[in-house]
Amino acid sequence: MTTPETTPTAVLFECTYQGRRHIGLGLPRGNEPLRLVPLGDRNLADLLLAGDDPADAEAVTVPAGEVTFRPPLLPDHPGGAMVGGFMQTHNVKVDADTPAQPNWFLKGLGDVLRLPGQDLRAPVGSVALTEEAEVVLVHVTDAAGVPRYVGYTFGNDLTDIGRFRRHRGHLSYAKLCDAAVAPWLFRGEPPRQVTGHVTIERDGEPGWRGEFTTGTKALHYGLDAIMSELFSYDALSVPGRVHYVYLGADRSSFHDGFRIADRDRVTLDFTSHGVTLSNTVRCEGP
């Protein structure tokens, strides 16, 4: 896996301010003003692939409430992004049937990504929904068709685990729910250890709370090996395509007997990294 050419872990984000695209520098704190660099006609993904400094233009400081955030590096056309991930990658989920390469699934194109505060859509006939707090790797495919790692963020891979448990061949259907993603792109090696907690509210009251641990240290698999196998398939190597790869999760509310329902609010607090995702689940029909 090719890693960014940066020594310290920097944080970048994209947003719209006064109708124009900007790059943000650093992890925002509360309602503090944001430091932004106008993107102009530049493309952030191209800048990162070229090793250019996206912050080489003059920065402006603006009120946090006047910007609209975007998923990191999300192309303007949803078809320019693929959202997928691996299943049962963590040591706590290893059993006698664990394969040498974890199952990979496709959640959808770029339009399934949801930022904090947006609804997470799930099928109205879902059997048993659960949250999955995960590290998300971001890769950009270069002109030669090579997916190159540019950083990581955090997400919630909402899953109909009940459907998968009912029929093991239905993993692909179980994953066809929206995925929450943080707008921040961490420019460094994937984190070894991430800790935090989940809070699920129902009708404004606490419904369930639990802790989670994730990161590469929690994986049963070698990250380089599973990513190399995934990107050995030419079908995934379209130049310019952005890949969001969810790395799998610790045990969730489902394993504690809780079932997420329509209108539940799910909050994932990645405490170790200062990132919070909070979304309301909506079960909708076609």
PLM feature spans:
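Catalytic-pocket segment enriched in acidic/His residues
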Residues: 2-6, 155, 161-286
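Active-site microenvironments in enzyme catalytic cores
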Residues: 2-21, 27-31, 36-202
